[in-house]
Amino acid sequence: MPGVDLLHARYLHKSFSRHTHESFVFAAITEGVEAFHYGSDLVHAGPGQIALVNPDTPHTGHAGVPEGWTYRTIYPDPELIRSIADDTLALRGDVGFTQPVVDDPYAARLVVAVHRAAEEGNALAADSLLRLVTARLLRSHGGRVASAAPRAAGARDAARARAVLEERMADPPTLERLAAELGTSPFALLRAFRTAYGMPPHTWLTDARVRRARRLLDAGLPPAEAAVAVGFTDQPHLNRHFTRSVGVPPGAYQRGKSR
């Protein structure tokens, strides 16, 4: 489906480092329990529940029970969510979900049904079911979310630092050099960046590299070339961080997208 990625996985000892997604995340837990940090909270999701993550929201992930967890996940594009919100709720602007975990067995079954329709090659059913579950979740747990646009002086420095790292991703400056370029101190920049984006600059940069590598893989670039293009030293370096954030190695991710 255009604008949508799907992942069906079981993890036992897997631990996702703090990362973000450009898309939304609907993760229907079918077995076990997933635990994850969302903001300052540690939350848990089990069978019949859905983990909901808004775009650009730092979060982690690990097993909440010794048996690990199994889930079926949908990653819908923000534009798709906005269009459905506009059609069903007349919501405009920054739309998102207000809770990281919701207890809704019917919606969880709809997420599974989206996967099964896609696996069967039934694009019409998959798209219809996706819109149905999205509208349901938006009606019960959606709303306008606060804009992340920084306003304070420190936050403006953080935004400028982020823009520099985005532009010079393959050859970024040190924290000291970056702070000097922005006319602030390294410690002040570190504190402002963490406050604005939920993680320090070096963690954000790794996450941003993975996100850009994912787009390059979607465009057909081989993993080794994608690794160099985003500033990783080599493909194993990309493999390690990509798997920590996405859950599968870049080669497996790309093969799954080509099916």
Question: What is the role of each PLM region?
Answer:
Residues R160-E166, D171-R211, D218, A227-G256:
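Basic/polar phosphate-binding segments, predominantly the helix-turn-helix DNA-binding elements
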Residues D87-A148:
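Amphipathic alpha-helical segments enriched in hydrophobic/aromatic residues interleaved with Lys/Arg
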